[in-house]
Amino acid sequence: MSPLISAASVLAAGLAVGLASIGPGVGQGTAAGQALEGIARQPEAEGKIRGTLLLSFAFMESLTIYGLVVALALLFANPFVS
């Protein structure tokens, strides 16, 4: 294996995890803040807001997991190495 390909794969794996975590992290913070505001304004809708929030968290976390899968593929099942 070429050292250049190995180094580029490790760098790409780190970037995949890092960049895949930034968007969902910001989105989850924003969603949680808006959910708290909604519950404060309308306490009787707490159950529905919480259910929707947890479902949206699951979808946001799936993006991070996809980044992790790409990083693991680059590290352990590298398609650029023969």
From Swiss-Prot:
The keyword Transmembrane helix applies. The keyword Nucleotide-binding does not apply. PROSITE patterns: ATPASE_C. The record marks 61 as: Reversibly protonated during proton transport. GO terms for cellular component: chloroplast thylakoid membrane; proton-transporting ATP synthase complex; proton-transporting two-sector ATPase complex, proton-transporting domain. It is a multi-pass membrane protein. It is found in: Plastid, Chloroplast thylakoid membrane. It comes from the Eukaryota. The chain crosses the membrane at residues 3-23, 57-77. InterPro entries: ATP_synth_csu_bac/chlpt, ATP_synth_F0_csu, ATP_synth_F0_csu_DDCD_BS, ATP_synth_F0_csu_sf, ATPase_proteolipid_c-like_dom, F/V-ATP_Csub_sf. GO terms for molecular function: lipid binding; proton-transporting ATP synthase activity, rotational mechanism. Its main location: plastid. Keywords: ATP synthesis, CF(0), Chloroplast, Hydrogen ion transport, Ion transport, Lipid-binding, Membrane, Plastid, Thylakoid, Transmembrane, Transmembrane helix, Transport. In plastids the F-type ATPase is also known as CF(1)CF(0). F-type ATPases have 2 components, F(1) - the catalytic core - and F(0) - the membrane proton channel. F(1) has five subunits: alpha(3), beta(3), gamma(1), delta(1), epsilon(1). F(0) has four main subunits: a(1), b(1), b'(1) and c(10-14). The alpha and beta chains form an alternating ring which encloses part of the gamma chain. F(1) is attached to F(0) by a central stalk formed by the gamma and epsilon chains, while a peripheral stalk is formed by the delta, b and b' chains. NCBIfam families: ATP_synt_c, PRK07354.1. F(1)F(0) ATP synthase produces ATP from ADP in the presence of a proton or sodium gradient. F-type ATPases consist of two structural domains, F(1) containing the extramembraneous catalytic core and F(0) containing the membrane proton channel, linked together by a central stalk and a peripheral stalk. During catalysis, ATP synthesis in the catalytic domain of F(1) is coupled via a rotary mechanism of the central stalk subunits to proton translocation. Belongs to the ATPase C chain family. This is ATP synthase subunit c, chloroplastic. The gene is atpH.
